[in-house]
Amino acid sequence: GVDVKFLTPDQVKEIWPLCNTSDLLGAIQHPEDGYIQPADLTQAMATGARNRGAEIYRNTAVVGIKQTKEGWIVETDKGAIECEHVISCSGNFARQTGKMVGLDIPVIPVEHQYIVTEAHPDILKRKKEGLPEMGVLRDSDSRWYMREEAGGLILGPYEDGAPACYVDGPSKDSEYELFQEDLDRLAPHIEGAIHRVPAFGEVGVKKVYNGAICYTPDGNPIVGPAWGLKNFWINEGHSFGIT
C-alpha cells in the first residue's frame, strides 16, 4: 500500500543533481516521504496534547510503577499519579521501565553516528536560486542515507555491529550524552557516499555525532498491549523515527 515511483537514472539525476548515476539501473521514490526536526515535532505533539486536556510534567522522574485492582499507580520523585492505563514510551530507558512491571522489553540502545559537512557551493547556489531541497537519498548497497543540512550534507550509515550502549539502561544524568566518534567504522560508508555523491568528498567535515539509538532484534518497533499486564501499553524501539 506504499505509494512509490520507479525512476530511471536520468530521473534520479533530475531530482538529485549531485548524485552519480553512471552505474545505476534505477531507483524507487517515495513522493510523500520526508523528515521533520524532532524538537519541532515534539513541541507540536505536546501542544496538541495540552489542547485536548493532557497535563505534561517536565523534569519528573518515574521511580516505580505498581498495579492495583483499579489500574496503576505511577510513583515519581514529585508524588504519585493514579491512572487506569500506562503507556511506556521511554526510549533508551525502555528496559528500565519494563523492569518496574516485570517485563523484559527487548530494546537495546546502540551507538549511531552521522557526519555533517561544511556548506557546498552547489547547494548554496540551489538555495539562492530558490530551488527545492533535495530529498533524503538512500543507498542500500552502501547502507547509508544522505540529505541536505544548512547548505551542506548529512551522511548517516546503517552500521553492522554497532556497539551496544546502556545495556542495563542509561543513568539519570545521560540526557543528550554523546560518545567518542569512530571514523574507522564509517570508512566503508564514506567511500560509498563519495562514489555516489562526489560533492560529499569536496567539502570538509563540520561535526561527527555519535549518540544512542534504540533497536529491537528485528528492527521493528514494539507497539501495542503488553503481554500479561492489563492496561499497560508499549510504544518502544522506533530506532530511526516514526512511520
Model segments located where?
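Central helical "cap/lid" subdomain
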Residues: 80-133
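Active-site lid/adjacent beta-loop-alpha segment flanking the redox-cofactor pocket in flavoenzymes
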Residues: 103-104, 120-232, 236-238
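Dinucleotide-binding Rossmann-like beta1-alpha1 core, especially the glycine-rich loop
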Residues: 1-15, 141-146, 151-152
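A short alpha-helix-loop-beta-strand transition element characteristic
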Residues: 1-11, 21, 104-107, 202
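A short, glycine/Asx- and small/polar-enriched loop/turn
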Residues: 18-24, 66-73, 215-219, 228-229
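Helical element adjacent to the flavin cofactor pocket in flavoenzyme catalytic cores
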Residues: 28-85, 89, 93-96
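Short loop/edge segments at beta-strand edges and connector loops
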Residues: 8, 58-60, 207
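Helix-loop-beta segment of a Rossmann-like dinucleotide-binding subdomain
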Residues: 6, 16-52, 170-177, 230-233
